[in-house]
């Protein structure tokens, strides 16, 4: 029984990691931002992604 719990834990960690990677997608021009790194190829100026 313990093996099933272990396998499930590993799968849950992998699933969470994949979701986190997808969630870190960049924001397009005009999107709200806090840091330059949030914008795809733009800068964060006045809380908006600018080219």
From Swiss-Prot:
<feature type="disulfide bond">
    <location>
        <begin position="39"/>
        <end position="49"/>
    </location>
</feature>
<keyword id="KW-1015">Disulfide bond</keyword>
<keyword id="KW-0800">Toxin</keyword>
<feature type="signal peptide">
    <location>
        <begin position="1"/>
        <end position="23"/>
    </location>
</feature>
<feature type="disulfide bond">
    <location>
        <begin position="33"/>
        <end position="44"/>
    </location>
</feature>
<keyword id="KW-0732">Signal</keyword>
<keyword id="KW-0872">Ion channel impairing toxin</keyword>
<comment type="function">
    <text>Induces neurotoxic effect on honeybees, including slow movements, disorientation and paralysis. Since it provokes similar symptoms than omega-atracotoxin, it is probable that it acts in the same way by inhibiting voltage-gated calcium channels.</text>
</comment>
<dbReference type="GO" id="GO:0005246">
    <property type="term" value="F:calcium channel regulator activity"/>
</dbReference>
<keyword id="KW-0528">Neurotoxin</keyword>
<comment type="similarity">
    <text>Belongs to the asilidin-1 family.</text>
</comment>
<dbReference type="GO" id="GO:0005576">
    <property type="term" value="C:extracellular region"/>
</dbReference>
<protein>
    <recommendedName>
        <fullName>U-Asilidin(1)-Mar1a</fullName>
    </recommendedName>
</protein>
<dbReference type="GO" id="GO:0090729">
    <property type="term" value="F:toxin activity"/>
</dbReference>
<keyword id="KW-0108">Calcium channel impairing toxin</keyword>
<keyword id="KW-0964">Secreted</keyword>
<keyword id="KW-1218">Voltage-gated calcium channel impairing toxin</keyword>
<feature type="disulfide bond">
    <location>
        <begin position="26"/>
        <end position="40"/>
    </location>
</feature>
<keyword id="KW-0960">Knottin</keyword>
């Amino acid at each position: 029984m313990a093996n099933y719990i272990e396998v499930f834990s590993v799968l849950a960690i992998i699933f969470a990691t994949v979701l986190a990677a997808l969630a870190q997608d960049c924001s397009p021009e005009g999107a709200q931002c806090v840091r330059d790194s949030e914008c795809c190829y733009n800068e964060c100026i006045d809380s908006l992604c600018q080219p």
